[in-house]
Amino acid sequence: MKTTYQGSCHCGAVRFEADLDLAKGTFKCNCSICFKTRAWLAPVAASDFRLLSGEESLADYQFNRRVLHHRFCTKCGVRPFSQGDGQLAVRVNCLDGVDPQELIDAPVKYFNMRHDDVKSPPAETRHL
């Protein structure tokens, strides 16, 4: 069942809300940027995401094939969400007031994007 979550960057300049069902799953990836930032994400349909404030505080980082836009707050540096190529995902650690038990119970799928393999998880995931 979807729940509407409020979310923000660390300084609060960027605020959003997203209708998510964390019980349907979250994901972690071992690509270079997700690994370096320890990203833990939840997919969200574009129609279920609303940027409430802070568009002017957002900057964009792209790399490699330049498909995804890794949006980050220019004031505090936090990346609350990524979007592009028909995808949108929010960082679960940017959800304000989320019950820790919901995060504990949320299934996590692992993607081996370091080797461009979306079908098989990495051999080791404890460090992600």
Describe the predicted segments one by one.
Residues 1-8, 13-128:
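A short Gly-Trp-Pro
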